[in-house]
Structure formats: C-alpha cells, structure tokens
Amino acid sequence: MKKIKLNDEVIIITGKNKDSTGAVIKVLDSKVLVEGLNLAKKHVRSNPNAGVTGGITEIEVPLAVSNVAIYNSATKKADRVGIRTNKDGIKERFFKSNNEVIV
C-alpha cells in the first residue's frame, strides 16, 4: 500500500515551492504530480490541424515523493503516514501524530 495516493492533500517540504499545499493529480512510481505547483514553461509549436495554438505554456512537472509529505488538516502541519490492519483485516493509512485514519 502506498503512503501517498491520488487526491491526497500534500505539502511540499523542500525546493522553490516549500510550504505550499495542493492535491495530488497523478502518482507515478517515485514521483507525484501536484495541482498548480512546480510549474515549468514549455514552448509549444502551433498545429492548425489539431487546433493547437503556439506559444509558451506552463505545465506541472512531477516532484519526488521524498520532497512531499501528507498534510494533516487537524494539526495544520506535515505528518508521517503509518499503515495498520483494522479489526476487519483491511489495511488502512493513519497519521502518526494523532492516530486518525486518513480518508
């Protein structure tokens, strides 16, 4: 079970966007794509057949999983994630600071 999943609220802990929060759009093997953060400019060639106008666009670039942490809204801080098995035998993720289950 992965500790960071799709639509999790994460906080960036290093880099130019430090202390910024956002939702995870896509999870790759060891990288995550965070909505509206870690933007880079890409030069796009126009393609009239596809209806694409040329110019400079901003795209989101993946971040390493080690540079983000899950955001705990109860404590308003970054938190660590633990994995445990509940009474029904189903694995669940929880915050290590206050033992709340991550929904």
Curated annotation (Swiss-Prot):
Entry GO MF terms: rRNA binding; structural constituent of ribosome
Gene Ontology BP term (one): translation
Keywords: Ribonucleoprotein, Ribosomal protein, RNA-binding, rRNA-binding
Source domain of life: Bacteria
Pfam families noted in UniProt: KOW, ribosomal_L24
Xref: SMART domains: KOW
Job of this protein: One of two assembly initiator proteins, it binds directly to the 5'-end of the 23S rRNA, where it nucleates assembly of the 50S subunit. One of the proteins that surrounds the polypeptide exit tunnel on the outside of the subunit.
NCBIfam families: rplX_bact
Name the record gives this protein: Large ribosomal subunit protein uL24
Organism: Ruthia magnifica subsp. Calyptogena magnifica
Lineage: Bacteria, Pseudomonadati, Pseudomonadota, Gammaproteobacteria, Candidatus Pseudothioglobaceae
